[in-house]
């Protein structure tokens, strides 16, 4: 992947969908789908080790992960990061590093009216064992203590909204991305990070 995060150099490499790479699927035998891999992969690198997180089955999904010393493999299935929970038949991971900690994003159906298609985004701190393996986690109500408050009068390089009514995002060459009101009594509620 190039610096522009859109284009790439070289050939696309396919990761073989093997039991060694993704673990053996439990339940009814399906020769076309012998592994736990379903969809939604997320690549992450930490301390010279590559992690491949993915939605794993059978449905209802859990989050599994594999590791490799090379981005092209071979990959070794390491187990479950997050078991099937939360009322949604599906789950997809995303991992970031922020202010010295790693965070694991996922979704569930915890909000009122939530289902497999009306999901809510959640975040947990991602913790590692000394050997690089991941500490399995459960879905929770989220991180209780914020890292830092947001200053509503300073430019924040992301449209951070805990709740909004009557706003939309726009973009221009001077400011970049921003949110704007669609009518006079529109608002956003800003919470902590």
Residue spans for each PLM region:
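Carbohydrate-active catalytic/glycan-binding domains of CAZyme proteins
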Residues: 1-192
